[in-house]
A protein has these predicted regions:
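Strongly charged
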Residues: 1-97
Length: 97
């Protein structure tokens, strides 16, 4: 499912214009991104959490130059589903292939 599919589905269910739904979804995604950029996790009860995970410093290799380089510690965004959400998905229909 793509963002366009979500916009169309929500527009049908709510009666809102697709442009309005698109603006709401874009605004939500922007707020999640800005919150994570400033180090603030986003918690949505019953759905899940957008959190930052710290990756430790490590040594990597450039195999084409046969050199080693240090990859500094950094944060990566992650989504952790709520228990209710994960259980609902687990008990749902199998994935379409």
């Amino acid at each position: 499912m793509t963002k366009a599919d979500i916009v169309a589905r929500l527009s049908d269910k709510t009666g809102l214009e697709k442009g309005d739904v698109q603006a709401i979804i874009d605004g939500f995604m922007r707020e999640v991104r800005v919150s994570l950029e400033t180090g603030e996790n986003v918690f949505l009860r019953g759905f899940g959490s957008f959190i930052l995970k710290k990756r430790a410093q490590k040594t990597g290799r450039n195999i084409s130059l046969n050199t080693t380089l240090v990859i500094p510690a950094h944060y990566v965004p992650s989504f952790k589903p709520a228990k209710v959400f994960a259980e609902t998905v687990k008990e749902g229909n199998p994935i379409k292939e």
